[in-house]
Amino acid sequence: MSNWQLPEGIDELTGDEAIAFEVTRRELLDLYQSWGYNIVVPPMIEYSDTLVLNSKSIDDKTFKFLDSASTRMLGVHSDITPQIARIDSKNAEPNGISRYCYINAILQTKADDFYASRSPIQAGAELYGYKGIDADIEVIVLMLSSLELLNITNITLSLGNTAIFNALCASANLEIKDVTVLRDIFRRKSVPDLESFLSKNKIKDADKFKSLISLDGNEEVLEKANGIFKSIPTIVDAINDLAKLNEFFKDQNIDVMFDLGEVKAYEYHDGVVFAAYSDKFSKAIAQGGRYDALSKSFDSNREATGFSFDLKFLIHQQENSINKSKVLNAPNIDNPDLNQFVNDLRSKGHVIKTDLNGLAEVDFIQENGKWRLKE
């Protein structure tokens, strides 16, 4: 094996892609700050129990090792959201609204799909301390603005609400092990597996589960869902929240679709969930949702919603047309006037390299004791 090879699923950014990433990173953080989101830089490593938070899906993706200093298990962050919950519980005013944003590399033991990286760069924004639908609207609009900044067009917004699945499981009085099995089936959208599970287990409201897994499409599915789940008030409320979101984004001329059986990969989502799709990509390019109960892991009680996406993946997929400045070559001589002239040009944005080995054609000339650029 060659020494320059990287592990499977680990990649890097170089050349124009690296420049595009850094330019975009700065623009995104400027965008988030203009909306009042504060930049945070969570640590790469924490105690594994505060990273995993009893989530099997996060645990499966987290690299863990024994810390010789504390003799406790440490983990490398595979998802930023649990860290934001810890940061908020430590620093936020109990009744105040807090906004956070970040762009950080993460590491995962396994990729989300065959073509995905195990070392994404996760960009995101999260809002804590407000339960109303206006918070969901704010973070979705900010997510769409992020994609617009990345010049991604023809976006379809997919909306769901994990409260529907959770409430149906509660109504059916399911045990935790059955909920776990069903969650995996719904995540994979496997109708045959659902039918097999229901045939082997005596589940209350089995027909409702069969209906839910296929409830996706345009706004007409909301009316259909109201008819199916009218006897479960929590689900009716969840559908009404989706209807409010639909009205808002329809007025913004956003193409909206619904997936009422969406459960998301991470168990901490417990309300409105959303994802952005574009015809240029075969999978969701950004996603997010509510996780009002997550902060309880840190003895807090803070409603929260947010979104994230893999910035490195999107940079890899883009045509990166960077407006690079012409590189100027300065002679390798010790001259105070030349040094001052070069520094002045650099401060104005010019890119200047010192011709250390004397092989390049220099772009500076001295006339009458003064330095100037060659014409």
Which residue ranges define each predicted feature?
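Positively charged, Gly/Ser-enriched RNA/tRNA-binding surfaces
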Residues: 17, 23-35, 46-49, 81-94, ...
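Short, basic, helix/turn surface patches
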Residues: 64-76, 184-187, 286-289, 374-375
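Short, surface-exposed recognition loops or helix-turn segments adjacent to catalytic cores
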Residues: 154-164, 182, 257-263
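Acidic, His- and aromatic-enriched active-site or binding-groove loops in soluble protein domains
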Residues: 61-69, 174-195
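Hydrophobic mid-domain F-helix/FG-region of cytochrome P450s
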Residues: 144-149, 163-173
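Beta-rich nucleic-acid/ligand-interaction surfaces
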Residues: 42-59, 160-170, 263-271, 361-362
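TRNA-binding/sensing appendages of the translation machinery
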Residues: 1-82, 137
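Cap/lid and interdomain-hinge subdomains that line or gate substrate/regulatory clefts
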Residues: 131, 135-136, 158, 173, ...
